[in-house]
Amino acid sequence: MVAKLRAEHALIFVPFVLALWSISRVWTVLPSIMQDEYIYTSQAKNLPFAEQFYSNYLFSLIMGITNSCGDEFYACTKTINSFFFISTVLLTFLIAIRFLTFRWSVFVASVTALSPIAIPVSYFMPETMYFSMMTLTIWLTLVVSKRDTWLLWVVSGLSLGATALVKPHAVFMLPAFVIFAFIYAYKKSASNWLKAIAAGVAVTVGFLVTKFGLGFAFAGTEGLKLFGGYGTPVGALTGAAAAEDVVVGTDSVARSGLEVLITVASTHFLAHASAMLLLAGIPLFLALRVSYSVVKTKQPIGEVSALFVLVALITVSMVGVVALFEAYVTASGDDHSDRLILRYYEFLIPQFVVMGLLLPRFTDSKRLFRIIQGSIIVAASMFFTIYYPPTFDKQYADASTLPGIGDSQGFFIFVGIFVSCAVIFWIVNPERGNLVIGRFIMPAVLILALVMSQNKLIEINGTPAYFDQAGWGTREFLEDVPGDRIMVVGQTRTEVFTVKFWIDEANIKDLLVVEGSVIAADNVSESDYVVTLGNIGVDFAHEVVTEGEGYKLVKVLR
């Protein structure tokens, strides 16, 4: 018996071995989200906290370690990200083991290791750390909810506040955690309003202590801004709505900021909601049903129900907020109408897997309600798989789940049909349908999404391009040159930002031109060194410092 238990416990190593495999697949991938990766590396490695536009000071503090790695800083980045990804796998196991058997918890952790959230390990971005911190916050929230003292809710807020110093977008989830604490405490205390309010206040206070207390410790008064350089949400939205002549899409038709805000927000909300229903429609509908039941009943919230209510609150809040954020950015002049950003809440994917396996724990809806729910999920799945590929740009900057699986419309529609068939089977036979969806359909879609996203990413950035060589070849000559005295001239943002990333200095200027352009002296009046990419000439006194295939570094002579 003891030997059997030891053999079973050895299974705990399986998800971590799978995580290492996922990491190895993207280990050699080169920078892929160029503008963001350049901004984050510049902040973390080269700028004081008070001068950073994004208030992700904990991320910058930890990633600043890569300064000690020299030219190998990108490998160090992936090592740090790997630690946080493996932490996410472990934390997911700890969440699952609260509700499931040991073997099924190992299964959940294994699916997490093989899910699309492994992709950001390759990036110099906060995503992997953010996913880990949000998973930690969910786990801590579930743990403290079982305790008898309202004061422990502070722990949930402290963790969420720390997460906001990794990625400020965590602040969008504060209402979800406050509402959850309020409802949970209210039900647990037999409708005691004071204890419910105290729990919600405790979460808020904990958040404010870490978000602004540590923020001030890092960056002084600059650390007291809620969203860093973005300002206040109300001010940002008001300014965007008041904008005039905003051009969206390829039709070149100018519209008012308010019209763009409403149009993009509504269409993107529908797209985000449809994407979530494709990935986890049955568990999410159950989560909404459980949440409604919790509000109606006077009974304390059960442990399993707590997970569903918390995930429902986070999902609903993030779908709405991210759609509004995309609309705000578009109305402000940076067209995001063709971008669907799921990466702000892809950390929920492991929780969807746990919820899928918990479906059999709940009483099935009556057939009429199953037909209604199933019809909505099927319609949303087919709508999204048809609408997404031709409408949205498949950027890794926006999501890890969709770029691979959504690259081919025909294949994506097949995925929609695959999910829809499972939902129809669930309508007819809910007992077996729950098992099929939780144990097979959802994990299969996630693993498929990972492999296809990895394959596409490796195809795009798995081999060094000439502009990678340009960054490597010029870096050593520019080590002691301030970034604002360097200019990179190229034909695409990808080329230019890749070179800036590898040079690894803050505030490097850039200029986009067409093939065969000649750069005049006026363009480089505030630069001492210029990197040119491709067939680009210069018309000013200069000295060639170094050159290679497709690039040249020149010193401006005055």
Task: Name every feature range the model reports, one short phrase each.
Residues 92-114, 132, 147-151, 155, ...:
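Transmembrane-helix signature of polytopic, membrane-embedded enzymes
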Residues 137-152, 187:
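Membrane-interface transmembrane helices that cradle and orient dolichyl/undecaprenyl
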Residues 108-109, 139-140, 152-167, 174-178, ...:
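Membrane-interface alpha helices of multi-pass inner-membrane proteins
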Residues 79-99, 132, 136-140:
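Transmembrane-helix motifs of polytopic, lipid-linked glycan transferases
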Residues 21-23, 193-295, 311-327, 380-392:
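Membrane-lumen/periplasm interface segments of specific transmembrane helices
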Residues 57, 61, 70-90, 120, ...:
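Loop-to-helix entry region of an early transmembrane alpha helix in multi-pass inner-membrane enzymes
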Residues 27-41, 50-65, 69-75, 466:
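Extracytoplasmic catalytic/substrate-binding loops of multi-pass membrane glycan-assembly enzymes
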Residues 122-130, 166-169:
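Short acidic/glycine- and proline-prone juxtamembrane loop motifs at membrane-interface regions
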